[in-house]
Swiss-Prot record:
GO CC annotations on file: cytosol
Molecular function, one GO term: anthranilate synthase activity
Catalytic residues (UniProt): C79 (nucleophile), H173 (for gatase activity), E175 (for gatase activity)
SUPFAM superfamilies, A to Z: Class I glutamine amidotransferase-like (SSF52317)
Encoding gene (name): trpG
Keywords: Amino-acid biosynthesis, Aromatic amino acid biosynthesis, Glutamine amidotransferase, Lyase, Tryptophan biosynthesis
Gene3D superfamilies: 3.40.50.880
Task performed by this protein: Part of a heterotetrameric complex that catalyzes the two-step biosynthesis of anthranilate, an intermediate in the biosynthesis of L-tryptophan. In the first step, the glutamine-binding beta subunit (TrpG) of anthranilate synthase (AS) provides the glutamine amidotransferase activity which generates ammonia as a substrate that, along with chorismate, is used in the second step, catalyzed by the large alpha subunit of AS (TrpE) to produce anthranilate. In the absence of TrpG, TrpE can synthesize anthranilate directly from chorismate and high concentrations of ammonia.
Annotated source species: Acinetobacter baylyi (strain ATCC 33305 / BD413 / ADP1)
Catalytic reaction annotation: chorismate + L-glutamine = anthranilate + pyruvate + L-glutamate + H(+)
Name of the molecule in the record: Anthranilate synthase component 2
Residues the record lists as binding L-glutamine: G52, P53, C54, Q83, S129, L130
Length: 194
């Protein structure tokens, strides 16, 4: 079973549908209606921390779940869930240079983890005003996806991967209809961490 932490976001069930199309039995729980003990009892095979309209600090059980289950259950964070991963491991969450609501950006990546065998760049939809700060990125996390500035340097972090644990995050929305390769990103997560 794949457990999805719903951070009260309208995209939650798009993610659920994508994972359902990948033959996953998905259980959805709201971030303020579940305990760590509940999750332990359910014994999910995967844990997905979903998007939401707030900051990671306001995302209920999201950060405690990351702290508790990182290294025990493969974990994927999407948008707010990605930010929660950054914060849970010691990074700062800051305002993005530009608020991105329903805007497409080119995603450049390392071809590692969930981005394996995808073209670089590819186009993905962004809905966020916060990002993981590059300068405070924890040593245990590596940048796997980013947007470029005009000079080719990293503009903003769009994906992270823990260096030793089965934990990855994406800032953009793979499940958005305009995002390319969304199914493949989720499929890669399931296959890599099976």
């Amino acid at each position: 079973m794949l457990l999805m932490i719903d951070n009260y976001d309208s995209f939650t069930y798009n993610i659920v549908q994508y994972f359902g199309e990948l033959n996953q039995d998905v259980k959805v729980v709201r971030n303020d209606q579940v305990t760590l003990e509940d999750i332990e009892r359910w014994q999910p095979k995967y844990l997905v921390v979903g998007p939401g309209p707030c900051s990671p600090t306001e995302a209920g059980i999201s950060i405690p779940a990351i702290h508790h289950f990182a290294g025990r259950i493969p974990l994927l964070g999407v948008c707010l869930g990605h930010q929660a991963i950054g914060q849970a491991f010691g990074g700062n969450i800051i305002r993005a240079k530009t608020v991105m609501h329903g805007r497409l950006s080119d995603m450049y990546h390392t071809d590692k983890g969930i981005f394996s065998n995808l073209p670089s760049p590819f186009s993905a939809t962004r809905y966020h005003s916060l990002v993981i700060e590059q300068e405070s990125l924890p040593e245990c996390l590596e940048v796997t996806c980013w947007t470029n500035q005009n000079d080719g340097s990293i503009e903003e972090i769009m994906g992270v991967k823990h260096k030793t644990l089965p934990v990855e995050g994406v800032q953009f929305h793979p499940e958005s209809i305009l995002s390319q390769h969304g199914h493949q990103i989720f499929k890669n997560f399931l296959e890599i961490y099976a």
